[in-house]
Amino acid sequence: GVIARRNLVLATGHSSSEEGLMLVREGGRQGVRRMVVTHAMNEPIVMSVSQMQEAATLGAFIEFVGGNIGDKDGSARMDRFADAIKKIGAEHCIVSSDLGQKGNPLPAEGFGAFLAALKARGLSDQDLDRVSRRNPATLLGLP
């Protein structure tokens, strides 16, 4: 397919968890080398850890988005994200802010708070560097 031939990134977008896995499976069959499960634990996707582990085994990066960690679900969401990253392995994960909307923190501030929240929940500096810098660079084909 076009994605494999042009070495593009296959992102699952806002597909359901089942559809996202289907895309990753088929992407692998088609020879796609760069894949990401977008917003894996957020609505409407809400993948289970076992689904994320399967996608990671198939070669996809699993994306966790911080959003506004100060909202009513922020602390519990950070707990879930940190736990999932530990179970899946930081080598298979990426993080992003998903910010920039009016009324939310600025992306740089929100992203810093997201990384601090993950560190407070036991992710090492090495893991944070991997999920925030090294893995995204790999996904994009950067050195």
Regions found by a protein language model. Name each.
Residues 1, 24-29, 51-59, 82-90:
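Acidic (Asp/Glu)-rich catalytic clusters
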Residues 1-49:
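Divalent metal-binding pocket/active-site signature
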Residues 10-12, 35-38, 62-64, 93-97:
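Hydrophobic faces of well-ordered beta-strands that scaffold small-molecule active sites
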Residues 15, 40-43, 65-69, 98-102:
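Active-site beta-loop-alpha junctions enriched in small/polar residues
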Residues 48-53, 74-82, 109-113:
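Charged helix-capping and loop-helix junction motifs
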Residues 57-76, 93, 124:
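Aromatic-anchored helix/helix-loop segment that forms the rim or "lid"
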Residues 90-107:
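Short acidic/histidine-rich active-site segments
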Residues 110-143:
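Mid-to-C-terminal alpha-helical segments outside catalytic/metal-binding sites
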